[in-house]
Amino acid sequence: MQVHDVELTISAVEENQYPATALPELALVGRSNVGKSSLTNVLINRKNYAHTSGQPGKTQTLNFYEVEHKLYFVDVPGYGYAKVSKKQREKFGKMIENYLTTREQLRGVVQLVDGRHAPTEDDRMMFQWLAYYHIPTLVVATKVDKVKPNAHNRIVKVVKEGLGAAKDQDLILFSATTKKGAESVWQWIEERTGVSD
């Protein structure tokens, strides 16, 4: 999809701040610093629109990016970061859970995992939680440019096994540097949301 118009509409901390539109929404979840902002920037064809944070756990709001007046990307607070207090973690947890389970406009979730390593326990828990609620999920293994191309098949196997995913689980290898996988991610998003050029 060709993207020309993007706007960060709201950084929400509670439900009454969510955009009051019927546009389809697509949530991006993943551990802190897994590359959510980088993926967003590649998808919307901007350099630093979605702020790439040097401080893991910094995104503590649900950030709604309106794309082409057709859909929203919703950047969800990163999970699994130790320096965020337990109270803050619980608060995020509740907000994320409410959003993912009750938001009618939500059409699917893109879960990012670091393609250089096996998924963490947090990654697995998030994936299983999404599966439990039957939320359509695309797994994106990031930073694959840091892994030799001949190891890419192994990444797919390790990630699926680590998440406890079915063999036919949608999974895309992605690199923000080379843009590998970006087109396939867009294709999945378009299928889920019914949005296209």
Swiss-Prot record:
Signal peptide: none annotated. GTP binds at residues 30-37, 57-61, 75-78, 142-145, 174-176. Belongs to the TRAFAC class TrmE-Era-EngA-EngB-Septin-like GTPase superfamily. EngB GTPase family. Residues 22-195 form the EngB-type G domain. Its cofactor is Mg(2+). HAMAP family: GTPase_EngB (MF_00321). Coiled coil: none annotated. Gene3D superfamilies: P-loop containing nucleotide triphosphate hydrolases. Keywords: Cell cycle, Cell division, GTP-binding, Magnesium, Metal-binding, Nucleotide-binding, Septation. Disulfide bonds: none annotated. GO terms for cellular component: cytosol. The lineage of its organism: Bacteria, Bacillati, Bacillota, Bacilli, Lactobacillales. SUPFAM superfamilies: P-loop containing nucleoside triphosphate hydrolases. Mg(2+) binds at S37, T59. Transmembrane segments: none annotated. CDD domains: YihA_EngB. One of its GO terms (biological process) is division septum assembly. InterPro entries: G_ENGB_dom, GTP-bd, GTP-bd_ribosome_bio_YsxC, P-loop_NTPase, Small_GTP-bd. One of its GO terms (molecular function) is metal ion binding. This is Probable GTP-binding protein EngB. Necessary for normal cell division and for the maintenance of normal septation.
